[in-house]
């Protein structure tokens, strides 16, 4: 399970180092094999261990292909998916096209989302986190299920 928000840096080639606290789990779960693709809702990237991504591919494969919204989602997620592997130093290279989509430069945030990570530009992450916090404080902003979840 991946949790927490980690400030990380991209080097001039677009490589970033996976925080050490996740490396052993990623090597154990998927031999360091990752899939990175765009997030279809937020201006960030999603980084999946290979096995988690394969579950998503199976779900996408089962969608009715005659529905335009299904094809659209398949094109976005699968069409932008790139296979990556952690190198011996625990780094991986984010392709230029995906860096451009998420507006990644030097400072980024790797945010654990249980079964995957989101990779954000640091300024964009800070703005979204602040807006999310303000939104959930609004009266009626949370469903009963979410209110019961908050400790």
Curated annotation (Swiss-Prot):
GO terms of biological process kind: negative regulation of DNA-templated transcription initiation
InterPro entries: MraZ (IPR003444), MraZ_C (IPR035644), MraZ_dom (IPR020603), MraZ_N (IPR035642), MraZ_sf (IPR038619), SpoVT-AbrB_dom (IPR007159), SpoVT-AbrB_sf (IPR037914)
Keywords: Cytoplasm, DNA-binding, Repeat, Transcription, Transcription regulation
CDD domains according to UniProt: MraZ_C, MraZ_N
Self-association state and partner proteins as the record states: Forms oligomers.
PROSITE patterns, per the entry: SPOVT_ABRB (PS51740)
Family label: Belongs to the MraZ family.
Domain SpoVT-AbrB per the UniProt entry, residue ranges: 5-52, 81-124
Keyword Transcription assigned: yes
Source organism: Ectopseudomonas mendocina (strain ymp)
Subcellular location: Cytoplasm, Nucleoid
Protein name, per record: Transcriptional regulator MraZ
PANTHER family for this protein: TRANSCRIPTIONAL REGULATOR MRAZ
SUPFAM superfamilies: AbrB/MazE/MraZ-like (SSF89447)
GO terms for MF: DNA-binding transcription factor activity; transcription cis-regulatory region binding
Coiled-coil residue spans: none
Gene Ontology CC terms: cytoplasm; nucleoid
């Amino acid at each position: 399970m991946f949790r927490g928000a980690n400030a990380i840096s991209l080097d001039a080639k677009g490589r970033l180092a996976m925080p050490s606290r996740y490396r052993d789990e990623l090597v154990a779960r998927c031999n360091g094999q990752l899939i990175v693709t765009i997030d279809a809702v937020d201006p960030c990237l999603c980084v999946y261990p290979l096995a988690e991504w394969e579950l998503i591919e199976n779900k996408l494969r089962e969608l009715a292909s005659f529905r335009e919204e299904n094809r659209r989602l398949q094109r976005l997620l699968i069409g932008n998916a790139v296979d990556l592997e952690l190198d011996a130093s625990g780094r991986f290279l984010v392709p230029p096209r995906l860096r451009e989509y998420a507006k990644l430069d030097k400072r980024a945030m790797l945010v654990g989302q249980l079964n995957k990570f989101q990779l954000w530009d640091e300024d964009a992450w800070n703005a979204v986190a602040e807006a999310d916090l303000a939104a959930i404080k609004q009266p009626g902003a949370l469903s009963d299920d979410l209110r019961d979840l908050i400790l």
